[in-house]
UniProtKB/Swiss-Prot annotation:
Domain of life: Eukaryota
Compartments, record wording: Secreted
Name of this chain's protein: Variegin
Origin organism lineage: Eukaryota, Metazoa, Ecdysozoa, Arthropoda, Chelicerata
Assigned keywords, A-Z: Glycoprotein, Protease inhibitor, Secreted, Serine protease inhibitor
Organism for this UniProt entry: Amblyomma variegatum (Tropical bont tick)
Length: 32
């Protein structure tokens, strides 16, 4: 819900912490 999103940091909502050294295969598969 929007209320929950507002409570969370905007950075976290806009772009979650991306560890390129530990990116899930799902993300890589989606990007391909």
């Amino acid at each position: 819900s929007d209320q929950g999103d507002v409570a969370e940091p905007k950075m976290h909502k806009t772009a979650p912490p991306f560890d390129f050294e530990a990116i899930p295969e799902e993300y890589l598969d989606d990007e391909s």
